[in-house]
């Protein structure tokens, strides 16, 4: 999953968290996060190529904002794993209840 690989880089994740608050220019992102502008631009390029952000040119600024689609896809992917773990948890819960019941029966039989 390309989105996960891109978001695994901590500085890119900081940018995404900042963009959750709303669109920002490269300069604003760099200033807010304490990056130099080329560093911010490099990370924004990767985020853009992965389809995580989109850019709009307004006068002489490039404004970046998050795209919802990659996060919706990521949510669906995570949900599929949550269902597996919930089923496993339910099975474990049933097994533990059965063990407790068996243990109680054994004590009652003694």
Where are these regions (language model features)?
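C-terminal regulatory/oligomerization modules of transcriptional regulators
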Residues: 1-2, 17-31, 37, 49-54, ...
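Short helix-coil-helix linker/hinge
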Residues: 6-11
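Pre-recognition alpha-helix immediately N-terminal to the DNA-recognition helix
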Residues: 13-15
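Short, hydrophobic-biased segments on the C-terminal half of alpha helices
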Residues: 44-45
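Short, Lys/Arg-rich nucleic-acid/phosphate-binding segment
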Residues: 57-63
């Amino acid at each position: 999953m390309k989105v996960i690989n891109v978001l695994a880089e901590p500085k890119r994740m900081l940018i995404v968290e900042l963009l959750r608050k709303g669109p920002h220019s490269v300069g604003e992102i760099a200033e807010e996060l304490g990056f130099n502008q080329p560093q911010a631009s490099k990370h924004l390029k990767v985020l853009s190529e992965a389809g995580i952000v989109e850019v709009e040119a307004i006068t002489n600024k490039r404004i970046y904002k998050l795209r919802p689609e990659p996060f919706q896809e990521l949510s669906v992917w995570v949900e599929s794993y949550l269902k597996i773990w919930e089923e496993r948890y339910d099975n474990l819960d049933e097994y533990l209840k059965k063990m407790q019941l068996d243990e109680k029966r054994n004590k009652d039989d003694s």
